[in-house]
Regions:
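Domain-terminus/edge residues, biased toward the C-terminal soluble/receptor-binding domains
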Residues: 23, 41-245
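Mid-domain, small-residue-enriched loop/turn segments at the edges of structured enzyme/sensor domains
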Residues: 1-55
Length: 245
């Protein structure tokens, strides 16, 4: 829609968008992020909010491609109609190192040296944010430290948290009743008895919940009889079928 003040309309949309992302400590006052001279004001954000924005941005394939580029050339047409080629080089000195797949730097006197980036190691993607670093090198050092700290606290746990075994020597997850049998139960194991889940060791206790299907009639080995769900602090980290064994 047409507007008399396109910039104000755009900034309003920016603030509305980040609120929908769950950002509670962010205020945009211009579209470019400068905060000095004629742009001085109350613009602000938090590391948490910037991480939410980075996470959302990385859902866009074009943005993922751009931040993963070391350098590129773009063609622009000036106001006089003349075409120009411009070289664009990345300021992300961590790109391609230890799983870093992209990032965005930013610097002002008030904000200091800032950097948000994305890492992906073995399919586990995270987003880091460093604000108000003292030097450009320090923001990258701090970023690498954050990423290594997180991945250093990842661990794998067995979904089958039991020492009991079925007759077939698989983990005994449950004994499930069958409505047609009053004196028998069905041994249940995991669809993949060796399955593991990856958790963050500092994120809280891992709990397990087993759900049972209503069973009747003939039940064969390998038939689904329920499911098991692993959670860590109410965050679902794994779900797997239980099968008759």
């Amino acid at each position: 829609p047409k507007t008399k003040d396109a910039e104000a309309t755009f900034v309003k949309a920016m603030n509305e968008r980040v609120k929908k992302l769950g950002c509670t400590g962010t205020l945009f006052e211009n579209p470019h992020g400068l905060d000095f001279d004629e742009w001085a004001g109350d613009m602000h954000s938090t590391a948490h909010d910037v991480a939410l924005m980075m996470q959302e941005a990385m859902k866009n394939d074009t943005i993922r491609e751009v931040v993963a580029s070391e350098d590129s050339w773009i063609e622009v047409t000036g106001a006089d109609g003349t075409d120009h080629s411009h070289s664009m080089d990345t300021h992300n000195y961590l790109l391609g190192q230890d799983g870093n797949i992209g990032g965005k730097t930013g610097t002002t006197d008030d904000a200091g040296y800032c950097f948000t980036s994305a890492y992906n190691r073995d399919g586990d993607e995270i987003y880091t944010v460093v604000l108000n670093s003292t030097t450009t090198d320090q923001r990258f050092t701090d970023t690498a430290t954050l990423a290594n700290w997180y991945y250093g606290h990842k661990m794998t746990v067995a979904i089958a948290n039991t020492q009991e075994k079925t007759a077939n020597d698989n983990p005994l997850m449950a004994r499930i009743s069958q409505t047609d049998w009053t004196d028998k139960t069905i041994d249940a194991t995991l669809a993949d008895p060796t399955a593991q889940a990856t958790v963050f060791s500092l994120a809280g206790e891992v709990t397990e919940k087993v759900s049972y299907d209503d069973l009747s009639g003939t039940v064969h080995v390998g038939d689904k009889v329920g499911s098991v769900t692993l959670k860590q602090d109410d965050t679902k980290i794994a779900v797997m079928d239980l099968v008759a064994d």
